Curated annotation (Swiss-Prot):
Belongs to the UreD family. The lineage of its organism: Eukaryota, Viridiplantae, Streptophyta, Embryophyta, Tracheophyta. GO terms for biological process: protein maturation; urea catabolic process. It holds the Pfam family UreD. Required for the maturation and activation of urease via the functional incorporation of the urease nickel metallocenter. Disruption phenotype: No visible phenotype under normal growth conditions, but mutant plants cannot grow on medium with urea as the sole source of nitrogen. The keyword Acyltransferase does not apply. This is Urease accessory protein D. The gene is URED. Keywords: Chaperone, Nickel insertion. URED, UREF and UREG may form a complex that acts as a GTP-hydrolysis-dependent molecular chaperone, activating the urease apoprotein. The keyword Magnesium does not apply.
Length: 294
């Protein structure tokens, strides 16, 4: 049985949560004033008791977003994954069905794994040809104040998007695992956060165009700065070393007729990722009633 389940349907012409269930360690908050009056959207805050996921916890969520509805799934703070007890793995499974002309926006705060933590996450989205989806999935390096940097044991995040009759549209897996040869921190170098953003659907067409253009311009500037710095260093020192950008983003399309856009990010700070998400998703404010990550 699922740990949590929410159904959003049209009632009297408005998006309404017609069913909401959750049990320990999960809790859903659906504030009625999350968006201004007149905004047709349901905001769903996913919360865990104790502010995090304990070793061995298993959370399973199901969301159904009916035809023409708009819903947001978010969090109040980062999802903390506490230290593992032995080989126990904390896991979180999310499955969502998005109806015709519906929009689901999944904009959580990042996952933060404590030292030795083991975490597995799988998110499955089932869409129709005219469904719309915004998905943000990201992780930080850990608790900086405690001197932890990519110090967890295991992290695996799967995001699968299916179209119509279970036709694979977008399949993605991120795996970070401790190895005896090279640690996660060594492989991640100085980057403190990695993120992925998915934008799919006709309702997001203009935002997709803007994000693609913004990422292109940002990375062009980064390359120019890196080249200038490299040239300056080569003139002043024979031991030239390429300067790694503090923020990297890439953008590509997927799906039929390029209806989907995926953005991948690596940054040396969590705050710069927050800033990027605020800027790129700001155009959603009229639809959602408030700007994501505001």
């Amino acid at each position: 049985m699922a740990t949590g389940k929410v159904v959003v349907e049209k009632v009297g012409g408005r998006s309404t949560a017609t069913s909401c269930f959750s049990k320990y360690p999960l809790k859903f908050l659906l504030p009625s004033k999350a968006a201004p009056a007149g905004t047709d959207v349901v905001w769903i805050y996913s919360i865990t008791y104790g502010g995090g996921i304990v070793s061995g916890d298993s959370i399973s969520c199901e969301f159904t977003i009916g035809d023409g509805c708009t819903a947001v799934i978010t969090t109040q703070s980062s999802t903390k994954v506490y230290k593992a007890i032995g080989s126990k793995c904390s896991e979180q499974i999310l499955e969502a069905r998005i109806g015709s002309e519906a929009l689901l926006v999944v904009i959580p705060d990042p996952v933060t794994c404590f030292s030795t933590a083991r975490y597995y996450q799988k998110q499955i989205f089932r869409l129709l040809s005219d469904s719309n989806l915004v998905l943000v999935d990201w992780i930080t390096s850990g608790r900086h104040a405690n001197g932890e940097k990519w110090d967890f044991e295991f992290y695996k995040s799967i995001n699968n998007v299916y179209l119509e009759d279970d036709h694979p549209l977008f399949l993605d897996t991120v795996l970070l695992e401790k190895r005896s040869i090279q640690s996660i921190a060594e492989r991640m170098q100085d980057y403190q956060a990695i993120a992925m953003v998915i934008l799919f659907g006709a309702k997001l067409k203009e935002i997709q165009k803007q994000v693609q253009e913004n990422v292109k311009n940002m990375m062009s500037e980064q390359l120019q700065l890196s080249y200038s710095s490299r040239r300056h260093k080569s003139e002043s020192s024979s031991r030239n070393r390429f300067m790694k950008p503090e923020f990297i983003a890439s953008c590509s399309t997927f799906g039929p007729e390029g209806k989907g856009v995926v953005v991948r990010i690596a940054s040396d700070s969590t705050e710069s990722v927050y800033n990027f998400l605020r800027q790129q998703l700001a155009e959603l404010e009229p639809v959602l009633g408030q700007a994501p990550y505001a």
